[in-house]
A protein has these predicted regions:
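Short, extreme N-terminal segment that most often corresponds to the first beta-strand
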Residues: 1-37
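Charged interaction segments
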Residues: 27-28, 48-174
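A compositional/structural signature for long, glycine/proline-rich flexible linkers
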Residues: 32, 41-51
Length: 174
């Protein structure tokens, strides 16, 4: 795990997210079981493995299981400090507060990007007149420079590190 990144994220999520979306988010932060259906789309980018000769038209393929992105806990291996993820209800039932600090490998960037797209659309400040809001950062574990995550116009704009590691990304605009 040489290519490790530190992810720090803080977002306020609207109260009108569906129960199914909330169940998937709870699974991602380690606060619930994996739902049968993943409406955020966390299962769109799972690896597929051939169970034989991939050139054989009758070859069967096995799909990897989707894994939670923010469920790591305990001491960080590379970035120091603790790995955490917390999802709590905001006062007056006006939504949810999410805070995350995780170590991620670039192989996790497709799943991360899926969550960031959803969080951008569902954030309290998603459509705050074009203003940009700092919601976190991504940092290579050996660097002191951070790549900011900025929420603007319903999107969390991802750093170049994520863009270059997710070349086949399809923005479905869900």
């Amino acid at each position: 795990m040489g290519d490790v990144y530190e992810l720090v994220l803080s977002a306020d999520i609207r109260a009108d997210v569906t129960d199914d979306e909330l169940a998937e988010l709870r699974w991602h932060v380690g606060e619930g079981p994996r739902p049968e259906w993943l409406p955020i789309g966390s299962d769109r980018y799972v690896e597929t493995y051939p169970l034989g000769d991939p050139d054989d038209p009758d070859c069967e393929w096995e799909n990897a299981e989707a894994e939670p992105v923010f469920a790591q806990r305990g001491a960080a291996r590379r970035v120091g400090g603790a790995l955490v993820a917390e999802l709590v209800a905001r006062e007056r039932s006006d939504g949810w507060a999410l805070t995350v600090r995780q170590e991620l490998h670039p192989d996790d960037f497709y799943r991360l990007r899926t969550l960031l797209d959803w969080l951008g659309r569902c954030s309290v400040d998603a459509h705050a007149g074009g203003a940009g809001f700092f919601v976190g950062y991504l940092r290579f574990h050996e660097s002191v420079e951070i790549a900011p995550l900025v929420l603007s116009n319903g999107r969390i704009h991802v750093p170049e590190d994520i863009e270059t590691h997710t070349p086949y990304w399809e923005d479905t605009g869900l």
